């Protein structure tokens, strides 16, 4: 399996290259040169697989010779041994919608499913090479905690996590900042999540800096995270009783990585009818799907902070597909975004996008009302992001018996207590291990959103860590 950049199809790379570099040197994102296909018979043969077995089948067609079969199985087994539910992913039926519980990992978010695998892949490769690596990531709340849990105490790794100051929930922040391992650095940036993402991308684009600190990343742009997320689309399809029905899946969407994994699953042969882009009032993607105009604007804070995003970092991958893999067109669109702060899809490109996706935004009032209604009718508490996915699916039209409906639950409700109290007038249930973080010491530094200041801080910490 080989990969190329969305901005240059001439150079190809191995999975190991793609995994360790995360972002292509030309600023593009890595994608496979071809998508592996599973026949309907192959898919049905996996019906009784455990999540770990299915994860191996999916990863095995993407990793090439980066890991031996025994190594890959060991990585997957170790990764999911830390989950609180032995099924890893569970389903709950509400109003004929299968709600997909993706929050049974150590930091209570869907990010754990991919991040634990990434952490163990890094450990495997770096233990063999003895090379040191510095991972830098931006988080709107959940990625950071998942990355820190997966990478803490790893021998050849440092992890630097940027989060927007005062724009993540206290639970989200404490899941990051109470981890005191010496290879973990939490940085609160004065600004928005988009500012954090911009800083990370600029560091990636600075080849001299990137090479000097051996930089890599675990944000959703890392292809391995996409592969790990493909797995649960296959898993939930095969957990339903009537597998002859095509799927409609609603995905709470911020950076477009989770829903893009669904798109790849469809290209691999999974019978997905539509993928629903569910967003809050920061509805850039809904507008783009309607008009073809991609025009980021100011981020407006919401009760669903992980979706308070205006620049979806994985959207370039779907651009590459809807432009029929014309890298020159992708470069032109991304240059327009950089220079004019927007781009316009043509009719063919917009039609290609609409062929696979629907989009619905959900207001703050609708989000809280959905949490309230589901709790009153089913005694189950949705987190705000999952509530947006649930409501977006309802907005897509009346549910037909011809399809199977799924809503991805991306986080545990206890991570967003203020929103839950606003909706149902009571605190969400909280696992015991989460209660303990509120009495633990925190460690983080606050920095201005200045690239040079940030780079200087990271270089100093890398130097101190190397000498110590």
Regions found by a protein language model. Give the residues of each.
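PLP-dependent amino-acid enzyme catalytic core
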Residues: 1-468
């Amino acid at each position: 399996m080989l990969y190329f950049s969305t901005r240059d199809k001439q150079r190809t790379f191995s999975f190991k290259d793609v995994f360790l570099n995360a972002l292509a040197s030309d600023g593009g994102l890595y994608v496979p040169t071809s998508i592996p296909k599973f026949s309907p018979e192959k898919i049905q043969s996996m019906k009784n697989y455990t999540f770990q077995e299915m994860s191996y089948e999916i990863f095995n067609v993407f990793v090439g010779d980066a890991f031996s079969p025994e190594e890959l199985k060991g990585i997957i087994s170790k990764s999911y041994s830390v989950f609180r539910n032995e099924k890893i992913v569970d389903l709950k039926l509400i109003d004929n919608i299968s709600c997909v519980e993706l929050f049974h990992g150590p930091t209570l978010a869907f990010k754990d499913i991919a991040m634990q695998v990434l952490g163990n892949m890094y450990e495997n490769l770096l233990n063999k090479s003895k090379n040191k690596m510095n991972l830098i990531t931006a988080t709107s709340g959940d990625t950071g905690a998942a990355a820190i849990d997966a990478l803490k105490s790893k021998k050849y790794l440092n992890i630097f996590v940027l989060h927007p100051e005062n724009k993540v929930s206290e639970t989200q922040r404490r899941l990051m900042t109470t981890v005191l391992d010496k290879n973990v650095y939490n940085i609160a940036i004065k600004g928005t999540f988009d500012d954090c993402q911009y800083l990370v991308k600029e560091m990636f684009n600075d080849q001299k800096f990137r090479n000097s600190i051996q930089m890599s990343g675990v944000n959703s742009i890392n292809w391995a995270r996409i592969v790990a997320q493909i797995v649960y689309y296959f898993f939930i399809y095969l957990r339903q009783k009537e597998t002859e029905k095509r799927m409609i899946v609603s995905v709470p969407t911020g950076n477009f990585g989770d829903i893009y994994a669904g798109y790849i699953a469809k290209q691999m042969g999974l019978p997905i009818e539509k993928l629903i882009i569910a967003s809050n009032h920061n509805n850039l993607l809904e507008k783009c799907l309607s008009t073809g105009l991609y025009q980021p604007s100011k981020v407006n804070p919401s009760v669903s902070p992980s979706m308070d995003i205006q620049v979806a970092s994985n959207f370039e991958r779907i651009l590459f597909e809807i432009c029929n893999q014309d890298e020159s067109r992708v470069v032109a669109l991304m240059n327009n975004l950089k220079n004019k702060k927007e781009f316009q899809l043509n009719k063919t490109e917009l039609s290609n996008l609409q062929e696979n996706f629907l989009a619905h935004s959900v207001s703050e009032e609708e989000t809280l009302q959905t949490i309230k209604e589901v709790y009153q009718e089913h005694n189950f508490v949705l987190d705000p992001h999952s509530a947006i996915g649930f409501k977006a699916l309802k907005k897509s039209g009346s549910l037909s018996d011809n399809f199977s409906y799924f809503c991805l639950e991306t986080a545990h409700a206890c991570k967003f207590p203020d929103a839950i109290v606003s909706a149902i007038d009571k605190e969400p249930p909280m696992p015991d291990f989460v209660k303990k973080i509120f009495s633990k010491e925190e460690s983080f530094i606050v920095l201005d959103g200045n690239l040079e200041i940030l780079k200087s801080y990271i270089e100093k910490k890398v130097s101190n860590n190397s000498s110590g």
